[in-house]
């Protein structure tokens, strides 16, 4: 049974993984035996994250590149495949958030959100899955959101990007499943992270969240690891095009 969830011998590339949820997933997946390929836009942050993983006894290497620049992505993926090893699992985690009322949202910030949260998923997935198709094996995990299904004030571009990633997940599944590639998404609910720090400190919002969520609390980021291990392992070999909500029941409550 343990082998069902083992990631020993697997190479997992996680975008935006030098900090935050990405680094948490890197640590969790690494403890199940995977070699983690840390990505960040800066080499310094990526190398620092690798050092931290090494201190935990986790195999890790750095692969710094900008997830919005196709030429950097293509070069980095070719380097990884040639010099590090085949990418068995890709986790599209990199993301940003910007907040403004819809009618005042700056066009450049809209473009930034779409570039990082949506277009980067397409570009990185395209580069990586070309190799997976050749091998007839691979897994892609797209980090989605509650906003893949629900809207919220001041973050319309974010919701638009995450809704698009949900449909990208399904479209990729339809095209890639025949090549033994599983493409799924994880949709976190409200977790205590750097990105949500302002909301966590907002007493009124926290009170609303606890009332709105059947579990009646914020999520602990550690609670995302199990979903990532499942979707990275052979336990999920016939799970495809699925969006796994880790949200304390929030989506199903009215």
Swiss-Prot record:
Q: Which GO terms describe its molecular function?
A: gluconate 5-dehydrogenase activity; protein homodimerization activity
Pfam families annotated for this entry? adh_short
Which keywords does the record carry? Carbohydrate metabolism, NAD, NADP, Oxidoreductase
Q: Which GO terms describe its biological process?
A: L-idonate catabolic process
Q: Which reaction does it catalyse?
A: D-gluconate + NAD(+) = 5-dehydro-D-gluconate + NADH + H(+); D-gluconate + NADP(+) = 5-dehydro-D-gluconate + NADPH + H(+)
Superkingdom of this protein's organism:
Bacteria
Q: What is its EC number?
A: 1.1.1.69
Instruction: Identify the pathway.
Output: Carbohydrate acid metabolism; L-idonate degradation
Active site per the UniProt annotation: 158
Which SUPFAM superfamilies does this one have? NAD(P)-binding Rossmann-fold domains
Q: What induces it?
A: Is up-regulated by L-idonate (15-fold) and by 5-ketogluconate (80-fold). Seems to be catabolite repressed. Is probably under the control of the positive regulator IdnR. Is part of the idnDOTR operon.
Please state what class of enzyme this protein is.
Answer: oxidoreductase
Residues annotated to bind substrate:
145
The residues listed in the UniProt record as binding NADP(+), with positions renumbered to this chain, are: 13-37
Q: Member of which family? A: Belongs to the short-chain dehydrogenases/reductases (SDR) family.
Q: Which purpose does this protein serve, as stated in its record?
A: Catalyzes the reduction of 5-keto-D-gluconate to D-gluconate, using either NADH or NADPH. Is likely involved in an L-idonate degradation pathway that allows E.coli to utilize L-idonate as the sole carbon and energy source. Is also able to catalyze the reverse reaction in vitro, but the D-gluconate oxidation by the enzyme can only proceed with NAD.
Protein name in UniProt: 5-keto-D-gluconate 5-reductase
Q: What is the lineage of its organism?
A: Bacteria, Pseudomonadati, Pseudomonadota, Gammaproteobacteria, Enterobacterales
What is the primary gene name for this protein? idnO
């Amino acid at each position: 049974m343990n082998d069902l969830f083992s990631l020993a011998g697997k190479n997992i590339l996680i975008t935006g993984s030098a900090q935050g949820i990405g680094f948490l997933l890197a640590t969790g997946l690494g403890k199940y035996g995977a070699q983690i390929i840390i990505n960040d836009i800066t080499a310094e942050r990526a190398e620092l994250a690798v050092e931290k993983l090494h201190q935990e006894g986790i195999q890790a290497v750095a692969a710094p590149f900008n997830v919005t620049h196709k030429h950097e992505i293509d070069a980095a993926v070719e380097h990884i495949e040639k010099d590090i090893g085949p990418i068995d699992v890709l986790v599209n985690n990199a993301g940003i958030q910007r907040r403004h009322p819809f009618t005042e949202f700056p066009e450049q910030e809209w473009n930034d959100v779409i570039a990082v949260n949506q277009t980067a998923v397409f570009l990185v997935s395209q580069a990586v899955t070309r190799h997976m198709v050749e091998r007839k094996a691979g897994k892609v995990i797209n980090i989605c959101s509650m906003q893949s299904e629900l809207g919220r004030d001041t973050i319309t571009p974010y919701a638009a990007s995450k809704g698009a990633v949900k449909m990208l997940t399904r479209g990729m599944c339809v095209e890639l499943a025949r090549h033994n590639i599983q493409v799924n998404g994880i949709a976190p609910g409200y977790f205590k992270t750097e990105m949500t720090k302002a909301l966590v400190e907002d007493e009124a919002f926290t009170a609303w969240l606890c009332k709105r969520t059947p579990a009646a609390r914020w999520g602990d980021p550690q609670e995302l690891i199990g979903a990532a291990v499942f979707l990275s392992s052979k336990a999920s070999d016939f799970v495809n095009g699925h969006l796994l909500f880790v949200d304390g029941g929030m989506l199903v409550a009215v």
